[in-house]
Amino acid sequence: MRITNYYYLLKGWEGNIAIYQYMDLDYLLSLLESKQYFVNRKCHFEDKGESVLPPKSLFGLNSIGVQLNKDEITKMTQKLSEKLNRYRESASWLTSCWTKDNTESLLMWKNYTTKIGVRIKSKIENVIASINTDKYKIVCGHISYDGYNSKPFEECLFSKERYYKDEYEVRFYFIQKDESINSLSGEFIAVTPETMIDEVILSPYINKNAAKIISQLLREEYSLQTVKLSKIELR
């Protein structure tokens, strides 16, 4: 990891990488009005692997058939227990999911928005720069889709099963510096929207006439200069 004053960027990643997030229009309007960005905790995500590591992830192929003495078994058990506990605790971390796929995805529109949805464009460095609080340590990296097998805790945080590979996910963790805070609800984080948002694309499910009105509203009321209609043509 590369360490700066308050965020960690996984090795091999640069801050100027473009990233995208799909959301409902009312969520975007709330963000613009309140300058508060809602981030959920990963324990609320649909994927069970976000909260609990699958048993098969605890043992590598090299463990099969290997005879260990009592001390080695004790050390291995302690190590696995620590990994499980740390990962279970990470389920309460505030987690923001983006994609690095610059091509519109009908699957993403369907999964992450209702009919009235938008896709915002940003950069890793812009998301970080937009945060107006020092309450969190921020960790960012891309998700690998080769499962959790025999990986250390830190790599498990940025891993998923291959079923999710079409997401091309880039993930931010917002880890509270005050460890006494013990909440399972999401949080609104203070942001500067104009720093975070470079571009908005409107959902292909929005009526064309309505899309033009929404586009004008976003430009005139919220000074979002780059608002585009979706390139996906639907009946």
Q: Which residue stretches match the model-derived regions?
A:
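Partner-binding and oligomerization surfaces adjacent to conserved cores of proteins
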Residues: 1-235
